[in-house]
């Protein structure tokens, strides 16, 4: 019977200790603006706005960390999601992809936005501004299809 209070106290101390060790997220060092999506790729303002609202937090080096990202468990979950997102697509390093990879990524952006896979439902639940409307998705797909075609035809 006396084990439960001791176990609970140990868990509380562990939580407090891990909170103290949790570091605030810092901007990415060495981020080069000349490699970002809009550095050499013409992106209409409404499309860029949609990308910033729905994609950039996980798919760029310009992550806006929410307040709850400083909480111990949430910090690790969110950091894992952002790391995975940047690994799949990093809009801050857009020019580092070859033109065919960029065209493929543009196709995936349209497909995932159209099917509701991106942004993920848990992100949309916490970030209402990330919910893309049907016209937003159509504009995003129209642009991505045009840009992908341009890249495949020899654009850079």
What is the meaning of each model-derived region?
Residues 65-80:
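Acidic helix-start/capping segments at beta-turn-to-alpha-helix junctions
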Residues 19-32:
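Aromatic-capped interface at the extracytoplasmic side
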Residues 6-22:
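Hydrophobic membrane-insertion alpha-helices, especially the h-region
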Residues 51-63, 118, 140:
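The canonical Cys-X-X-Cys-His
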Residues 1-4:
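Positively charged n-region of N-terminal signal peptides that target proteins for export
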